[in-house]
Amino acid sequence: MASGPSRTAAEEYRPNRYVSLPAELDPATYDTPLEKRRAEAERLAIRARLKRQYLLQLNTPKPPRVIEDPALLRWDYARTHNVYPTFRPTPKTSFLGAVFAIGPILFWIAAFKTERVSSAGGVEHQGAPGCKT
């Protein structure tokens, strides 16, 4: 008597406590939850819409002078306006921050102080006309 169909290697695989389960055999790889699939479909729809918008700007008979690439705008925003998640304070950045924050203030204080001292020292006190001092 022949037994039922033989099991495949994936069905016979049992996880080992020393080795993690390969991604190919992990059911979570294939059985994604509905909300995760919806979020992924939404991201793909946004990406397709942005790509279509860019290609329409690029391939019009009278293209605008500046063609805005949404991916480039997002990259530029992430690079310039969103620096705090990737910023690491080091002695160099702390020193440069202090120099650029306090340096101009000290410069203008010194400039006005020396100007006031030099202009006050050159002018001698003169009394009113006809008044002897």
Swiss-Prot record:
The UniProt keyword set, sorted, is: Electron transport, Membrane, Mitochondrion, Mitochondrion inner membrane, Respiratory chain, Transmembrane, Transmembrane helix, Transport
Q: Where in the cell is it found?
A: Mitochondrion inner membrane
User: Which chain regions cross the lipid bilayer?
Assistant: 92-112
Superkingdom, natural source = Eukaryota
**Listed Pfam families:** NDUF_B4
Topology in the lipid bilayer is annotated as: Single-pass membrane protein
GO CC term (a single one) = mitochondrial inner membrane
Tell me the InterPro entries matching this sequence: NADH_UbQ_OxRdtase_NDUFB4_su
Q: How does it assemble?
A: Complex I is composed of 45 different subunits.
Q: What does this protein do?
A: Accessory subunit of the mitochondrial membrane respiratory chain NADH dehydrogenase (Complex I), that is believed not to be involved in catalysis. Complex I functions in the transfer of electrons from NADH to the respiratory chain. The immediate electron acceptor for the enzyme is believed to be ubiquinone.
Instruction: Tell me its family.
Output: Belongs to the complex I NDUFB4 subunit family.
Protein's UniProt name: NADH dehydrogenase [ubiquinone] 1 beta subcomplex subunit 4
Instruction: Please report the organism this UniProt entry assigns to the protein.
Output: Gallus gallus (Chicken)
Give the gene symbol.
NDUFB4
